A protein has these predicted regions:
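Conserved CoA-thioester-binding segment of acyl-CoA-metabolizing enzymes
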Residues: 1-60, 81, 95
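Glycine- (often His-adjacent) and acidic-residue-rich active-site loop
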Residues: 4, 59-95, 112, 142, ...
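A secondary-structure boundary/capping signal
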Residues: 21, 58-60, 66-69, 107-109, ...
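Charged catalytic carboxylate motif
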Residues: 31-35, 89, 96, 195, ...
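Crotonase-fold acyl-CoA enzyme core
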Residues: 95-211
Length: 227
């Protein structure tokens, strides 16, 4: 597995997917996307085996993710995948997590910008530290949030606020995100890691297949594809 993403399964049924590139604010290069694919495959196997009953997506360091690493575009240009296939591969790194049949919870500390925000949106729930800040910055570079953000964000915050974030690259702080429904809980900074993990462990102790089916059973979730 890529060392940029770490998957761990604990005895209490919590599987943890950790972005592990703190020196780069967990910017997403090709290795991160490869690691997300590998981590999701391992999580799926553990779920099927009954050893993982809920997933926590977190990050090492002071940021959840600053977004795409600019090197990713050079890596694509020098690779042998057609652009459409490459974009589909990146999208599937997030969709694979979203499609897991147990609850998937993102724990956001610091910035979740661009692709980082889009990864958080792929989770079924989002927990935030008080210093969390979420944004889709793609408009600043004449890009679109094409890793599922344009589909998932309106489901979460509504069309108007989604347009605001997507068109203006507005940075949304934790309290505003909570008011908008962009995050579901803001947890204390001093024990954010422990509290967020305890929340996921509580989910893991419950009827996780039923809980995990809730996001996929929503009529809004069936109205559009991220592709």
């Amino acid at each position: 597995m890529s060392d940029r993403v770490v998957f761990e399964a604990a005895e209490d049924g919590v599987g943890t997917v950790t972005l592990n590139r703190p020196d780069k604010l967990n910017a997403m290069d090709q290795g991160v996307f490869d690691g997300l694919h590998e981590a999701t495959d391992r999580a799926r196997e553990a779920i099927e085996a009954g050893t993982v009953r809920a997933i926590l997506v977190r990050a090492e360091g002071r940021a959840f993710s600053s977004g795409l690493d600019i090197s990713l575009f050079g890596q694509q240009a020098s690779g042998d995948k057609p652009a459409d296939d490459w974009i589909a591969y990146l999208q599937q790194a997030f969709t694979g997590l979203e499609d897991l049949r147990v609850p998937v919870v993102a724990a956001i500390r610091g910035v979740a910008f661009g692709a980082g925000c889009q990864l958080a949106l792929a989770a079924h729930m989002r927990l935030a530290a008080p210093d969390a800040e979420l944004a889709l910055l793609e408009a600043k570079w004449a890009l679109v949030p094409d890793l599922g953000g344009l589909t998932r964000l309106p489901r979460v915050v509504g069309l108007g606020r989604a347009a605001d974030m997507s068109m203006t690259a507005r940075r949304v702080d934790a309290e505003t995100a909570l008011a908008w429904g962009l995050v579901d809980r803001v947890l204390p900074a001093e024990d954010f890691e422990a509290t967020s993990r305890a929340f996921v462990a509580e989910l893991a102790a419950g009827p996780t297949v039923a809980i995990g089916a809730v996001p996929r059973s929503s009529p809004a979730a069936e109205d559009a594809s991220v592709h």
